[in-house]
Amino acid sequence: MAFLFISNEWKYQQLIFKINCWHFCYYPKNYLGGSILSKRLFIPPSACRIDLSVFPWAFICSPWNFCSTWSSLICSPCFSTVWVSLLICSPWRSTTWTNWLICSPCFSTVWVNLLICSPWAAKVVSIFVSRWLFEFLYSLNSLRVTYSVFTGITGLLSLNCLLNLPENSTLLFSGLMMYQPEKVPFLVFFTMSWNSFSL
């Protein structure tokens, strides 16, 4: 069934986007204790401990859509200041530390444009995030295969677009998730490291 989703990547991405947005953003309080949707998708309650209501909804609602939002939405010169000011620096988020460090006009432009929007930084960050993600999925023991098929393939499809990985890498990693999940963390980290340092 997983390869059927891969054959139609766009519709699969839109489906996961709607599920994540409905699950994480519209019901953030239910996410704390593991909602009904998470139990149906075999997501363990231990993964539902972060209160996502304190984070910007526009960024959380697209956790796997880096290909569409990374360049056009977050990394645009005009939107960078608006994103930091309106979402991160909103009144329900504002504190002394946030206003002084993140919400300053100078820091917002430098941090968003130079750090997040640089291709090298994006790839380096994605390497550590992906390595932590797949190590976490592997540590789920009995639930690792089901949870990996649901979240891992979605992340691989987006990382495949973000890091310009070969098309066969998505099929390779997806197959390893279902048949040999213990080999996934090493191969993913090796492939992304090789692609990152070959800029």
Swiss-Prot record:
Topology term for the membrane: Multi-pass membrane protein
Transmembrane segments: 41-61, 72-92, 109-129, 145-165
GO cellular component assignments: plasma membrane
Subcellular location(s) of the protein: Cell membrane
Keyword entries, A-Z: Cell membrane, Membrane, Transmembrane, Transmembrane helix
Top-level division of the source organism's lineage: Bacteria
Family: To M.pneumoniae MPN_037.
Protein name (record): Uncharacterized protein MPN_465
Organism whose genome encodes this protein: Mycoplasma pneumoniae (strain ATCC 29342 / M129 / Subtype 1) (Mycoplasmoides pneumoniae)
